[in-house]
């Protein structure tokens, strides 16, 4: 995707916020527990390479990604000796590529290990489905069989075992406790404990520090976003959001009563009013459902009117502004703030989706 460096729409990523979130989390971890930075999905929309650099500077001991390509991108960017774990499924035919690049892979099927021809040692993390229902082995028998298969091949190493909690971001903990108990049953069934046992995502690491095991996978909260609104007031420290989204007015005009804007003419002025066109649209991740939401102009709320277009969006202004005036879509302006949580609430989704939708057509600028 082409990045729009010659368009006045941009994202600012505050590296100091990322560092502070990591440091605050590390301060509450036992000394022997590593923090791995989860940088999948372009670092949740924040930019994988720059975020990885920032996280490493702050003390992260490794990285988690979703797909092998993300791991390879980190290696190509200079992270040659860092621990990298692919959390998602990897094709069997790509095992050698991972092995040659010293990338750890998730395994959750016995048949995946059959007839592997490896040219370099491959490090495996066994995924346990303790109740998430996506990927993972579910019984002690499966775990022992896979452990035996790995032990027979001197090119395979069972480096880790892990699970993922479905309800760690909820205050009610009964299902979380069921998952933890199931995982521990499978863990204790192994003859040899792997080097890395890890279960905690952001929510679990914040609310359940006792289950840190050997490492935590610090994702959404590294970016200063709460795993869920339900636990926002129960967090052990204040999270600092790292992402802000800005644009500028490229056209300002006055509408007369009866004038309509955008596709479908869904918005019609009932009085004389000022509107501005913004150079951002659903092709950038500002999806059509943002229509009716608001932005900040000089610290004042300005509603998005009409339908969001592919490349442009129209807002109603509180008064006349000059072309080129700055507009805050996510972030703070003159003491007022629009958060990713605010957008998520309006869109009936979660803050993860809000930032992940912001694609690479919008340039990222890194500050602090």
UniProtKB/Swiss-Prot annotation:
Coiled coil regions, renumbered to chain: none
GO cellular component: cytosol
This enzyme's EC code(s): 5.1.1.1
Gene Ontology biological process: D-alanine biosynthetic process; peptidoglycan biosynthetic process
Post-translational modification N6-(pyridoxal phosphate)lysine, affected residues: 40
Pfam family, one: Ala_racemase_C
Catalysed reactions, as listed in the record: L-alanine = D-alanine
Binding-site residues for substrate, renumbered to this chain: 134, 310
Cofactors (names): pyridoxal 5'-phosphate
Keyword terms, alphabetized: Isomerase, Pyridoxal phosphate
Pathway assignment: Amino-acid biosynthesis; D-alanine biosynthesis; D-alanine from L-alanine: step 1/1
Gene Ontology MF term list: alanine racemase activity; pyridoxal phosphate binding
Function: Catalyzes the interconversion of L-alanine and D-alanine. May also act on other amino acids.
Similarity remark: Belongs to the alanine racemase family.
HAMAP family: Ala_racemase
Protein name: Alanine racemase
Organism: Listeria monocytogenes serotype 4b (strain F2365)
